Amino acid sequence: MDCKVVSLNEKDQFIPKIKSSDPVITGLFQYDAAQQTSFEKRMSKENNGREAALANVIREYMSDLKLSNEQELNIQHLANGSKVVIGGQQAGLFGGPLYTFHKIFSIITLSKELTDTHKQQVVPVFWIAGEDHDFDEVNHTFVYNENHGSLHKVKYHTMEMPETTVSRYYPDKAELKQTLKTMFIHMKETVHTQGLLEICDRIIDQYDSWTDMFKALLHETFKAYGVLFIDAQFEPLRKMEAPMFKKILKKHQLLDDAFRATQQRTQNQGLNAMIQTDTNVHLFLHDENMRQLVSYDGKHFKLNKTDKTYIKEEIINIAENQPELFSNNVVTRPLMEEWLFNTVAFVGGPSEIKYWAELKDVFELFDVEMPIVMPRLRITYLNDRIEKLLSKYNIPLEKVLVDGVEGERSKFIREQASHQFIEKVEGMIEQQRRLNKDLLDEVAGNQNNINLVNKNNEIHIQQYDYLLKRYLLNIERENDISMKQFREIQETLHPMGGLQERIWNPLQILNDFGTDVFKPSTYPPLSYTFDHIIIKP
């Protein structure tokens, strides 16, 4: 597999500004992610003393998996005080978007580079956001159908949308297998298809909860790298979090004030507010089989779906004795994660790192230092066919990744058309505009006639526009094969107006290039970069 790095002219300059150590952006974080001294400082930080307990919890969480030697070693390293690089993601259907895998590769790559540079073992940890309850965000994925040259949405259907956390959700296995079958119907059959289908079927048969199936697929893919997994909703982990839940409840108003102040500061720097929340407690409580947002009305802590209320002593007692009923929101999850782990760096997507920029004062309030916040690696897969099509139409890859192919497609259509025809129609439009101006001069001062002339002009312009559009549409139809090829480039490299990794599913890559495509023996070694990586399988 070949690998190259390209620099894109990105519309969103947040990550390029991190790369260039822009003082406005780096000032939002504790550390400058582009400076080696930041890593030296984090690597030398004292540990928090929770590493041995965390190692036991992670071992228990992964006990239903057959651990690799690399994972066994990393659990031992963690227990002995090794620091971590961490990142997480929601448990998406069949692995979710490709960027989930790329986030894990980011964690692996940075962990290895830090281990090699500092001669200290750094452990890669992936945090599964099983506490989330927005099932609509994880119950679907997309698959590219080569025969149709288009993407198709594949969704796991439920009679009722679950309101509990995804870790507490147990999908119907027959329905899930039908969803899997639908996905494979759209994918082309390759020599890898049957083996991949068997792996997925086995995971569905062997595991019951939504997040356990997600974990098993990730484990199957990344165990050889030594990645450790933990679910935010895992009960033994929640028990470790009890002291922090109590602190959050006691300081909830100060926490909310700190968050709002930091968010306002980011807006003053010209950034849009990323975190949208009405709560002033920033925790959820599981009650009546629903994940319910907690807020404080000045006297009571109140749940948003059942209107159940608690006085402070009651809710703190729940945090102490039943911490598994609590879960974090977007504000407190990063805080809890860093309180638990001895983290060198947190790896996040473009939106995630903007969330973290709104939390600096929250970390300081709880005397927890924000780690280095690193943008994850961004990766696109370029197969031989798409590369040949780019060459055929002389389209720069970097341009497609940023803008898509619509501009190049329109240019191609006009090149196939009669230039004289287009020029004459456009000339008639310009002539009509001049005529309209002359006629308006003739009827100046008479509003009825002005309206009549303008309406007549509008009709003529519409007719010429229609003539030109229909003519170009006919050219499109005459070049149907080329139009399909442009669509193929678009759906592969810039699907739904964004990067491939945000839409495509990992199963598509596994099916096309083999079930070992992401394994160390096949996948190219990566170097950490803020630029874009192109991989040719």
Swiss-Prot record:
According to the UniProt entry, what is the EC number of this protein?
A: 6.-.-.-
Molecular function (Gene Ontology), one example: ligase activity
Query: Per its UniProt entry, which superkingdom is the organism in?
Result: Bacteria
What keywords does the record list, in alphabetical order?
Coiled coil, Ligase
Tell me which InterPro entries the record gives.
Answer: Bacillithiol_biosynth_BshC, CC_BshC, Rossmann-like_BshC
| Biological classification of the source | Bacteria, Bacillati, Bacillota, Bacilli, Bacillales
- UniProt name for this protein: Putative cysteine ligase BshC
Record family assignment? Belongs to the BshC family.
Q: Which residues form a coiled coil?
A: 422-450
Describe the function of this protein: Involved in bacillithiol (BSH) biosynthesis. May catalyze the last step of the pathway, the addition of cysteine to glucosamine malate (GlcN-Mal) to generate BSH.
NCBIfam families hit by this protein: thiol_BshC
For this UniProt entry, which residues form the secretion signal? none
